[in-house]
Amino acid sequence: MLGFGPFELILIVVIIALLFGARKLPELGKGMGRGIKEFKQEMHEPSPPRPQVTDIPSQRLDPVTGAPVSTESTVPASDRRS
């Protein structure tokens, strides 16, 4: 697979130092350490209970406007034929 010897590791460290600068490396290390620590803490903490989802009756939506459409007839009661 990947055989990283001492020469390859030194080369990688030198390239990183050139890209970020020697002064930024401690800050990068601290940031990565904090991120890993927070990630591990979150993995061990139980997640808060999720709220129970209840069935909500679905509404019909107008396909053009996306507004809810009344399920009742739009014809006034006086104009309806029985």
Curated annotation (Swiss-Prot):
Quote the biased-composition stretches of kind Basic and acidic residues, using this chain's numbering: 36-47
Instruction: List GO terms (cellular component aspect).
Output: TAT protein transport complex
Establish whether keyword Membrane is in the entry: yes
Checking InterPro entries in the record gives:
TatA/B/E, TatA/E
Ranges that cross the membrane: 1-21
Query: Subcellular localization, per the record?
Result: Cell membrane
Going by the UniProt record, its keywords in alphabetical order are:
Cell membrane, Membrane, Protein transport, Translocation, Transmembrane, Transmembrane helix, Transport
Q: Output one GO MF annotation.
A: protein transmembrane transporter activity
Task: Tell me, in a sentence or two, what this protein's role is.
Answer: Part of the twin-arginine translocation (Tat) system that transports large folded proteins containing a characteristic twin-arginine motif in their signal peptide across membranes. TatA could form the protein-conducting channel of the Tat system.
Listed HAMAP family? TatA_E
This one is known as: Sec-independent protein translocase protein TatA
Species whose genome carries this gene: Deinococcus deserti (strain DSM 17065 / CIP 109153 / LMG 22923 / VCD115)
